[in-house]
Amino acid sequence: MSELKNDRFLRALMRQPVDVTPVWMMRQAGRYLPEYRASRARAGSFMDLCKNAEFACEVTLQPLERFELDAAILFSDILTIPDAMGLGLYFETGEGPRFKKTVRTEADVNALHMPDADTDLGYVMNAVRTIRRELNGRVPLIGFSGSPWTLATYMVEGGSSKDFREIKKLAYGQPELLHLLLDKLADSVADYLNAQIRAGAQAVQIFDTWGGALTAAGYLEFSLAYMKKIVSKLQREADGRPVPVILFTKNGGQWLEHIADAGADALGLDWTTEISEARRRVGDRVSLQGNMDPAALYAPPAAIRDQVSRILASFGSGSGHVFNLGHGITPDVDPEHAKVFIDAVHELSAPYHQNA
């Protein structure tokens, strides 16, 4: 593998000195880019983009051609595991992801195929290898998965949900059945992420998009416990350097102390938590990633720079911060505004690293 030319993202995750604060964006390869829309039209569908290594590589690299990003993230979907388990993933226009089958009974859980990450999900590993080769050491590559709880919400509900009624029926009425499902998912996610690391991912992120829908006790029992299990099983070194792990629970700001004790290297923050407060609460146990409101990218350039400046000042001096949005970039954002954001992070953060 090529030597890494820009490692500030990995260094910041490990709280090592950096020259400027590194930055990347969730969904940085996505519909806001006209070149992405052109690639998707050529591929035919979203899943065709994901399952073809050349297309997945092409769209992963597109934002790096436009912006001075400090990391690339594998282009894929969090629902690849449930799809490989036999649930039949498809996308309904205007409805988002759907499954042909749902998982609501013990028989449904027992019928799930336990996927082999290197064969059933081999298309993902092919994409990782292709992207690493094409990156040629330019920036690190992030692999990822959904959290067991988040994957389970889609599997039980049959797709996206506003109130999580069906999975909460299990949580309150048949918790042992939900634990059976979550345990299977935790094993699959750990295998999947380790396969990505073997294929070349240099950091991994677990997206717990719907953890914030739980009560405090429910979060610890049904979400965080299974992310901890995954973290404990991950390969934490490759190519002679650490492979950092990031946990991101949307709307999880009230549980930062618990998440900081889960064994990961960094926590993702959404925009509802003040980053200075988060830093005070977790100390130097973990790095922090985030946390500008994606909607701030609709603002004029000067206002975007002001938002970046405010968050940098809130975090303060020293390493341990990876700048990001608090969730994915939205499809109707002007790419030029994304460029203003990324350039502002590098330009305005240098004074905070003068003693590096």
From Swiss-Prot:
CDD domains: URO-D (cd00717). It is an enzyme of class 4 (lyase). It holds the Pfam family URO-D. It catalyses: uroporphyrinogen III + 4 H(+) = coproporphyrinogen III + 4 CO2. GO terms for cellular component: cytosol. Pathway: Porphyrin-containing compound metabolism; protoporphyrin-IX biosynthesis; coproporphyrinogen-III from 5-aminolevulinate: step 4/4. Its EC number is 4.1.1.37. Substrate binds at R27, Q28, A29, G30, R31, D77, Y154, T209, H327. It is found in: Cytoplasm. InterPro entries: UROD/MetE-like_sf, Uroporphyrinogen_deCO2ase_HemE, Uroporphyrinogen_deCOase. The keyword Lyase applies. Belongs to the uroporphyrinogen decarboxylase family. Catalyzes the decarboxylation of four acetate groups of uroporphyrinogen-III to yield coproporphyrinogen-III. This is Uroporphyrinogen decarboxylase. It comes from Hahella chejuensis (strain KCTC 2396). The gene is hemE.
